[in-house]
Amino acid sequence: KDLAKIVMPNELFFNIIDQATEMGFDDFGLTPITGEIFMDKRFFEKLEYLETHPKVSSYHFFTNFTVLDAAAILKLTALKKLSIFSISVYGHDQSSFVHITQRNDIAYRRLVDNLQTLHQILAQADLQIEIGWRTYKSFDHITEGDDYGLSRSVIRLRDSYDIPLHITKNYDNWGGIITDKDVNGLDLDVVDCQSMPKIGACSLIFYKLQVMADGQVNACACRDVNATLAIGDLSSQRLADILSDRNQTYMDLIDSQQRGEFKPICHSCSFYRSIYKYHPVYEYHSKPQTTLEEVYETLERA
């Protein structure tokens, strides 16, 4: 990532929520495109704003679960509008965790401790959780032995509380940013999508946009880490004017993708979802189908 690592100020966050809810948005994804959400020392203040906002119905986020402590995990159980939080686990033991994440043994120990703490808390509290597990392709769910505290903790959570567990052994190329050279020496495969056909605009630029920490509005919340698909800036524009057919930058992006013209980050992206193909992931997330004409009508009303 080339952009500076910054944390969104609370005042900007509050303003975004106010503008978005006035437009009719009521569910919010809080995960930054890169980085750990709990690195924001004031994150719980943001959550409190969402909890007390009359027009916010729900929110969700991902975490690598290495930054929290027991007190923070317990605070999550008091959140009424948290629809689900997803834990991203990398590796299956200390060695694989360190090699994949480039973090140290302290971070590994903290992750295992937090998973064990979560297991204890869930015996007395109700939290909607899912776990995404990414590790070596040769891993076969070993849980025995002193070095398998991580895999043992993950399996125990799944079995004890029926937590959805999604295991991935193919790694995304992040729009061509990640290549096989980046995982050299690791038992990992990077998905190569240089030849993936792209027909029509990507559906993500219609429903999965993101406000960056600096106020830029980016048309992709999934893989465009450097905001090359930015369509506006809240430091000088209203959100209603950015998500509108009055915003020529946004309209040009849609039109160019409809013509089959994709920017470099999109050309190599393995996360592309054509508006002309209903993807199975939408069934999992219960996404209703919307036509392009209906989208244009919505933007016209903004």
Model regions and ranges:
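Short, small/polar residue-rich loop motifs at catalytic or cofactor-binding pockets
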Residues: 202-205
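C-terminal accessory region of radical SAM enzymes
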Residues: 114-116, 120-130, 155-197, 216-217, ...
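Short cysteine/histidine-rich metal-coordination sites, predominantly Zn2+-binding motifs
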Residues: 8-12, 281-295
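Iron-sulfur (Fe-S) cluster-binding modules
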Residues: 299-302
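Conserved glycine-rich "GG(E/T)P / GGGxP" loop and the immediately following alpha-helix
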Residues: 1-169
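Short, acidic, Ser/Thr-enriched surface-loop or helix-capping motifs
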Residues: 211-212
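Intrinsically disordered, low-complexity polar segments enriched in Ser/Thr/Pro and acidic
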Residues: 38, 60, 106, 254, ...
